[in-house]
Amino acid sequence: MKFSMNGMLFAMSSALDAVESEIFDVATFHSKRVACLSILLGAKMGYSGEALSDLAGAAVMHDNALTEYVAARRLLGNQTTASSIELGSHCEMGERNMCVLPFYDHIKGAVLYHHENADGSGPFRKTAAETPMYAQLIHLADQLDNSFHLNTMSPGKYASVLAWLEENRGTQFAPAVTDLFADAVPIEAAEKMEGTQVSSALSALLPVYTPDYDNETVVSISTVFARIVDFKSHFTSTHSLGIAEKAAEMGRYYGENEDICTRLF
């Protein structure tokens, strides 16, 4: 089945952004800006084509377990705030969800280690030398947007960004990554990520990529996304997944082939 993986990932990012905005008070379209920044940095490092597409997928899904994490804390009677997030648990949940994606072997560790600092002070105590490069790029992009709310840009803000990166060079971020930023993300590129235009900016940065996936893979991917949506509220619980399963069952009952049943799911 021809399946636009990036299209589905970017659609899911809107739901994830809504949750992250609630909890962390980050600006909307956060996931897409993290993807844009990661792609620009990755391209400057020499990645291209499918490698950039994989990086974008990991970047846009870097906080995919946030809804699940919030739901787990809710069951324990705990409220979730930015200061109460246990980064290690949140990252482990997210990495587990990424395992079903067909390009997982290319992005292994990107979500798990995206909160690691270059000096080894992150949740898993990994230094830059021990952290996958995709995770390092996503970490910088994530922290940058969280700190500066890059939904708006100005010369003054851009200068503050460069100063902040220099201040955190070698501690939060590896010099090999921070030193690329000014060339990889000039102010003109940052301005294209403002507000709703970030969606167009992201589309322009990525190649069109719609590979064939077997039905089992498509169902596995869809199951993860259904879980993410369902964890958004205790009222929905397993609602999306339940509807999908019943739709596929009805298709089989009426004699549809597995391709049609997968599309129904």
Per-region residue spans from a language model:
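Histidine- and acidic-residue-rich, metal-dependent catalytic cores
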Residues: 2-265
